Amino acid sequence: MIRELPSQRHIDILVHDFFRNVAWHYDIVDEAAFMNQLAQWRRLTHDQFKRGPDALPTTLRSFPALLFQVLAQALLFQPAQHIETLNDLKYAVDMELSDRAAEYSDAGRRLASSFRKSEPTLTGVQAELMRACFEKTTGAVIEAWHTLGTAIRDAQELGLHLIEPDSTTYSRSAKSSDREMGRNVWLILHLWDAHMGIVLGRPMSTRMSPNDVASPMSSRDSSGNQRPPQPRDVILCGYHTAYKFLQEIHDLEKLEDWRIPVDKIHETILTNIANLPGWATVQRSRQGEPPWLSAALETMYTNVQFVVFALHRPFIFAEPNSRHKAFDAAMQILESQGRLFDQTEPLQYKAFSLVFATFDAMVLVAAVHIRFPDELREQFTATRRILELGIERLKSLQARKNVLANSALSIVERLYQKMLATVYPEETLDNGQGGTDDGSFTIMETETVGANWGTILQPDLGDVLVPQPMNELLRSGYLAQSLSTSPSLPAAYGQDQFGMSIMGSFGCDSMPYNITDDTLHGAK
């Protein structure tokens, strides 16, 4: 498998591109440490390779697995005007760089699986987490969840969850220690565990105390000079603003009275947003700003609002206050996603992260207007505009063969038209109002992920459980086969039962929706 690595020239190009364009997303791999490992790797002799993995230094056995994942991510996020020599990596006329990226990532996965049988290493955990990044980005979300579980278990085997921070303030030195990087990797593992647990309705396997997470660095160094923020600063800023509450939100189902903790978390997040450091605010000075920072902060804004969104979504049908707050968070998510999309290269449109937050937020916004047409009417003009922009974004992603965007678009377009018909019943769809393409509504129902929104958005909806649209899209769409092999785990708030009814509102036969007494009690 080592022979599948590209030439040194191509490796150098892609490694440079990775740390310039991609690494800031999660800050999983430290550049100085990685380059040191790469230099050591290149000093290995042919004889060492011939004698097999046991002849390699322990610290380098997992390195090629990580290298393959770095190359894969770099290829996946190449700009449209990429270096011409990268086309040499293609060996067929119809290949794209993303095809080669998938092959490299698969090779890295096979190597990581081979070395897991021996002693786990931090480099191996990084390789597994990078593989989960690739799977999530390319739409294999269920597979990413399984890979994440493997990485978490190996990290626990290494004791990464037991490492205490050396300082209450994050410090980026010229060379990151294994201890510091291990702690950083564990934080990302925890955040992914919490986020995917909420999105997929799965149990969490990690816990983390906010007291054990360092704060972002000051905007000035020890000499008082201005210093640019680092990717880790953005992640830590988002964590202490909102991400730290994800594990509490995941556990809300265990509480009899959820109103007090929900209100407390909401107010704390608002206070934290108001107290963001100057470099992280929308009103910040952009002079001398590193090129990655704008997209990183926009991603952070989306994720912070997602926490507010996730906090209130389970209660939108039972509590008007939560309904309005979830609606506001969804609108802010869509505005943030629009700004982020404007910064995204077309070649990155296959990245499924551009679908996740947009789809969930659009479904909730439309559902609230459909179910409660007399509420938030003053917001409807803005809602209509922002949904139309979201639909156009999904169409752009669909045109770049983003399969999940294709399924999401079919649902959202139908919800959009149902919303128009509900709020303004005098308007006819034949007039072409709404800004969407009428031809898209002639698609056969079997080509889309069905959703019985006509059934669930009825006047007696008060006791019906709240949807997890993205989870249902993954369960019912083209990823259903891979999901069917996944462990059957209960979803929070009984949302799997809710999802069973999401079949057929747009003309197909639907399954009957059965609600038990226990389910009704949980919903209330």
Language model: regions and residue ranges:
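Fungal transcription factor middle regulatory core
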Residues: 36-39, 79-80, 84-90, 155-287, ...
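Intrinsically disordered, low-complexity transcriptional activation domains
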Residues: 400, 429-524
